[in-house]
Amino acid sequence: RADFDPDVVYVSTLQRTSQTARILFPEAKLVPVDGLKEMCFGSFEGRNFIEMEKDPEYQAWVKANCESPCPDGERKTDFSDRICRTVAELIDKALAAGEERLVILAHGGTQMAAMERFAVPHRDYYAWCGPNAGGFVLDAKDWTEKHLLYLVKTVQYTKESRA
């Protein structure tokens, strides 16, 4: 369980974010947002590295630093644009309503895309890989003028991190 109780938590429409949100924020109203979904990996979906290591399409995708489109899936730039547009809309809505806290519980790739685009200090996509069951606390003091979010701290909500 998290150490605070938000009224609302925005989650993706994929089941695992709602499951995690119910554990961390059991009293919160969950609001599913389709635009927060993890990248569509197309024909790679549901397969692990070992299953794909000899797949030429997978090898080509990895060789291209995962920037090319997944077969029948999304290109990383399109995914990042979708995520950042959705996150910006949620932030704008929260600020317009005078809300002091916005909680988004999303997938790792979703977090990395938003952090790469908006976070200070600036880091590349893969450098924002957060901990399991964790994420980032951000300050939106310059959001309206600069669309920047300042890193306050990294959080992790696992049994190991609380010992």
Where are these regions (language model features)?
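Generic beta-sheet signal
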Residues: D7, G98-G108
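Acidic, low-complexity terminal tails and accessory targeting/binding regions
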Residues: M39-I50, D92-E100, M115-A163
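Glycine-rich phosphate-binding loops at beta-strand->alpha-helix junctions
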Residues: T110-A114
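ANL superfamily AMP-binding
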Residues: R1-D5, T86-A88, D92
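Phosphate-coordination/substrate-recognition cap region in phosphate-metabolizing enzymes
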Residues: R1-E57
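Short glycine/proline- and acidic residue-enriched helix-loop micro-motifs
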Residues: Q59-D78
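Amphipathic, non-transmembrane alpha-helical scaffold segments
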Residues: L14, K76, S80-C84
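Short beta-strand scaffold positions
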Residues: V11-S12, D81, L105-A106
